[in-house]
């Protein structure tokens, strides 16, 4: 299986590579200016974290809006990638009233896909100034925290996912399982 990782300069991206490789998948880093055709070789795509604000700096994300709209493969957005997916597909993203940094407890409401087998609460690593306040039409909220209503989301066909937190960071409990569950969706 081949995974594309769209890279926005996030500080934890090497950990995404490490986790996906550990789980036995091939992964390739893709700069966001590549034509959408070059991403059609991947079985799934992960949109990484990064320092940008999607509502103010979308141009810095290159062709990523086209990737989200045109690729017909499973997708996972992490932090900035989560916000990008929501924004491009019609959700609402804004500056967080209470930015989250460090360990945060989330409440899981729906665990049937990327959060499969998880308990109702999970400690996760956060690092964000912006947040998704309303997911796109056709998406459901999988998890929330005291400060961010949309900590995880999925579309109705369980093929596009977003998580506000960083599953790649060791401080996130069971983070490797989120990648494992996502790769399971990619293999279907």
UniProtKB/Swiss-Prot annotation:
Keyword tags: ATP-binding, Glutamine amidotransferase, GMP biosynthesis, Ligase, Nucleotide-binding, Purine biosynthesis
Catalysed reaction equations from the record: XMP + L-glutamine + ATP + H2O = GMP + L-glutamate + AMP + diphosphate + 2 H(+)
Metabolic or biological pathway: Purine metabolism; GMP biosynthesis; GMP from XMP (L-Gln route): step 1/1
Catalytic-site annotation from UniProt: 79 (nucleophile), 166, 168
Annotated GO MF terms: ATP binding; GMP synthase (glutamine-hydrolyzing) activity
Disulphide connectivity of cysteines: none
Superkingdom of this protein's organism: Archaea
Any Pfam family matching the protein: GATase
Record domain Glutamine amidotransferase type-1: where: 2-188
Known EC number: 6.3.5.2
InterPro entries: Class_I_gatase-like, GATASE, GMP_synth_GATase, GMP_synthase_A
Subunit-level organization: Heterodimer composed of a glutamine amidotransferase subunit (A) and a GMP-binding subunit (B).
Task of the protein: Catalyzes the synthesis of GMP from XMP.
Protein name per UniProt: GMP synthase [glutamine-hydrolyzing] subunit A
Organism: Saccharolobus solfataricus (strain ATCC 35092 / DSM 1617 / JCM 11322 / P2) (Sulfolobus solfataricus)
Lineage: Archaea, Thermoproteota, Thermoprotei, Sulfolobales, Sulfolobaceae
């Amino acid at each position: 299986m081949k995974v594309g990782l769209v890279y926005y300069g996030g500080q934890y991206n090497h950990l995404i590579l490490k986790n996906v490789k550990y789980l036995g998948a091939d992964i390739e880093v893709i700069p966001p200016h590549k034509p959408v055709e070059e991403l059609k070789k991947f079985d799934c795509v992960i949109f990484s974290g990064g320092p940008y604000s999607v509502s103010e700096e979308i141009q810095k994300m290159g062709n990523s809006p086209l990737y989200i709209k045109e690729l017909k493969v499973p997708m996972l957005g992490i932090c900035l990638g989560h916000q990008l997916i929501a924004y491009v597909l019609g959700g609402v993203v804004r500056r967080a009233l209470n930015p989250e940094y460090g360990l945060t407890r989330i409440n899981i409401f729906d665990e049937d896909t990327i959060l499969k087998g998880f308990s109702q609460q999970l400690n996760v690593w956060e690092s964000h100034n912006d947040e998704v306040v309303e997911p796109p039409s056709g998406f459901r909220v999988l998890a929330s925290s005291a400060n961010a209503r949309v900590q995880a989301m999925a579309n109705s066909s369980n093929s596009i996912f977003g998580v506000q937190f960083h599953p790649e960071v060791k401080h996130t409990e069971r983070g490797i399982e989120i990648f494992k569950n996502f790769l399971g969706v990619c293999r279907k």
